[in-house]
Amino acid sequence: MKIVILDGYAANPGDLDYHLLEKLGEVVVYPRTSDAEKVERAKDADIVLLNKVQMDAETLAQLPNLKYIGIQATGFNVVDIKAAKELGIIVTNIPAYSTDSVAQMTFALILAVTNRVEHYAQENRNERWAYNKDFCYWDTPLMELADKTLGIMGLGNIGMKVACIARQFGMNICAFTSKSASSLPEWIQKVSKEGLLATSDILSLHCPLNDDTYHFINAESLEKMKDTAILVNTGRGPLVDEEAVAAALHDGSLAAYCADVMTEEPPSKDNPLWNEPNAYLTPHIAWATYEARERLNKQVAANVKAFLEGNPINVVNK
């Protein structure tokens, strides 16, 4: 059984091993694979594992030996799952492996803004505190999270984890969600889209990307938000219109934008957000703690093992 990993570096830059997979077959690992290389590298594979390598219908048709695709991520839009099903190829994903890590990054971004961490660390490097006349130095106030309203778009595993953390900070929590109000904890208020935009001091996006959520945050929705609001996106880049967000930051109608995801990844050097000092951007690393990647690695092997035993799990193209 030949197992080919097409972009192994994404989830394993070298600090993990593949011993669980190696028990299941011959494992060939490529750190990265371009579109021009993917057919040649996968042509003899029974099993292909990938993170961001695209597998469209045309590519799948050129891989007659392929029986299984294991996506090393939760999202599965990199594979044409309909075409895979028609060709008898089982496709699986890894749900919920990064919930804690992404929720943690969400609050790392929020606290970086509300506590002005980057600003004051740089001021210390510039010796502003050392030459200050008082025991403490500050030139701009911090913001307490208690009693502020956190609005959440999407209450899946990550959205709910973020809500639980926010509760410990004493925040008021509202959510725009497809879940019924009766199914939510009493401390989460279900609101409309308009209510979410209007009441949130901090608005955090945790919904899937689809036709309904594409550019959920755009020029029109930004006009309905508080000009003191902080917008956080650790979901998917295209949930926001980045040009509209940059414009709102520039004219002061949005206080800050925190994001671990971008519409184009890696982003263009011409992206307007680079010019905005109140844009706090991290390079799609919220999911990538060692612990999350270790869970991912183990679940990838468990998915492959279940497939080989004839009882596939986490199948996304049933």
Q: Language-model features: where?
A:
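N-terminal Rossmann-fold NAD(P) dinucleotide-binding loop
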Residues: 159-160
